[in-house]
């Protein structure tokens, strides 16, 4: 349980995976030559990895240059918000049997573009936080 003095709590690994699996839109952070690029992607959780589809372009080029990535998703309801961050290595899926496996996840592009490459993020660490909503506590300190 969270009180007003500690509205932020850390999630255990299982809860972080549960929240990650319950969402469909996240943000992929990839290092580029000029900084960190952040891409919104729809995704699916497959075991302890994250899978998304992409097309040729900046996202795939960045992943080929540097496979270390950070992935974030969040969710919220009336009483709390959640943020989950996963870190790992990303690689295009090239094995035919693995492609068939990830195709079965039902990932479809949200926009009408051709995205023929599946990418798997092999998660090496995952963390999450819960933010309990409440009234602005500033009055308490006046």
Regions found by a protein language model. Name each.
Residues 132-142:
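Short, charged, intrinsically disordered terminal tails
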Residues 34, 58-60, 135:
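Short, surface-exposed beta-strand-loop junctions and turns on beta-sheet-rich folds
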Residues 23-55, 71:
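Short beta-strand segments
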Residues 11-13, 54-58:
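Charged, amphipathic alpha-helical segments
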Residues 56-119, 123-125:
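Short, structured beta-strand-loop surface elements
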Residues 49-51, 120, 127:
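General beta-strand recognition
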Residues 99-102, 130-134:
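Short, charged, solvent-exposed linker or helix-capping segments at domain edges/interfaces
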């Amino acid at each position: 349980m969270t009180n007003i003095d500690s509205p932020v709590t850390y999630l255990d690994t299982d809860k972080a995976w549960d929240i990650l699996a319950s969402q469909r839109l996240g943000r992929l952070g990839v290092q580029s030559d000029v900084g960190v690029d952040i891409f919104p992607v729809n995704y699916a959780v497959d075991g302890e990895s994250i899978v998304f589809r992409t097309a040729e372009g900046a996202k795939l080029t960045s992943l080929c240059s540097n496979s270390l990535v950070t992935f974030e998703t969040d969710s919220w309801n009336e009483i709390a918000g959640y943020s989950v961050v996963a870190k790992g290595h990303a690689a295009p899926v090239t094995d035919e049997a693995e492609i068939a496996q990830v195709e079965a996840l039902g990932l479809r592009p949200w926009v009408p573009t051709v995205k023929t490459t599946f990418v798997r993020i092999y998660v090496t660490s995952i963390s999450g936080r819960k933010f309990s909503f409440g009234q602005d506590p500033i009055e308490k300190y006046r």
